Amino acid sequence: MAITKYKAAAVTSEPGWFDLEGGVRKTIDFINEAGQAGCKFVAFPEVWIPGYPYWMWKVTYLQSLPMLKRYRENSMAVDSEEMRRIRRAARDNQIFVSLGFSEIDHATLYLSQVLIGPDGAVINHRRKIKPTHVEKLVYGDGAGDTFMSVSETEIGRVGQLNCWENMNPFLKSLNVSAGEQVHVAAWPVYPGKERQVYPDPATNYADPASDLVTPEYAIETGTWTLAPFQRLSVEGLKINTPEGVEPETDPSVYNGHARIYRPDGSLVVKPEKDFDGLLFVDIDLNECHLTKVLADFAGHYMRPDLIRLLVDTRRKELITEADPNGSIATYSTRQRLGLDKPLEKKEGEDTPDVL
């Protein structure tokens, strides 16, 4: 049965830098906390596990190599016990979870998101379609069958996008066309405008993401929009600085950027710079009616006879296989990664994975 009114949460916290196990434990802690607070939904930032590698914007190639190796070693596969523990936590708390993580698949990393249901099933698995600028040195592109965002659930039509995908007009159009009602605008960690240095444009700083891009997404799509954001501490600055380089000493410019917006773009909540934890919101899906009755860009307020978007969701692989009948074998990335397999409790597990 559809749930139209419920409590949700957005995470604004410091990740477990370069620490897969620590990141999984912290993720489960937040899922437990959200569940105990009565939430039906909790949203995590972009590549929450094992943290966003902001150092890639500031280091040389040689400086990056030890950090990149460690980052890859602590990225997470979707068909892994770490992911299954997170899925079990969602099931134990009967909660929907939007999780951003650095996914390792064979030898390539992806800026990935999953939407996990209250039964522990992975409802949606997606990858950022195009890493941003220097991110291309760390991550690969999403494919045709890994970029769809919106899922039909009992808490509404829930969508997820990473970072600057949230200002991509084509992806917004695609999400609107799916009737999105609740959106996760997942952001990484990067500094506020206090750190802007000419000629770097303001686009590349956190304030426009929090206070322009995210509310614009809400008002253009008429959706409840949760914007989880990572944070940094003095210790985090040290961990994310290569050996031989003097670390920054003031993490405050990286903090306080998470937001939650109503479907009309008005602000629900923003944290103080020293806040670390969950931001809460009481969602009422029926509020979307009055925003979408004014502007539904997938329905009464669009002209598909004049403007249309072509979307290709076919999987493309380097190798095309023939099946036993001589036809082309077809399977999805989801199937290849084992996401269609049912989630089972680990042997001897009788209690929730509360850490």
From Swiss-Prot:
Domain of life: Eukaryota
EC number(s) recorded for this UniProt protein: 4.2.1.66
GO biological process, one term: cyanide catabolic process
All copies of domain CN hydrolase, residue ranges: 6-285
Assembly description: Oligomer of dimers, forming left-handed helical fibers.
Function statement: Catalyzes the hydration of cyanide to formamide. Degradation of cyanide may be important for plant pathogenic fungi in infection of cyanogenic plants.
Family indicated by similarity: Belongs to the carbon-nitrogen hydrolase superfamily. Nitrilase family.
Protein name: Cyanide hydratase
Biological source species: Gibberella zeae (strain ATCC MYA-4620 / CBS 123657 / FGSC 9075 / NRRL 31084 / PH-1) (Wheat head blight fungus)
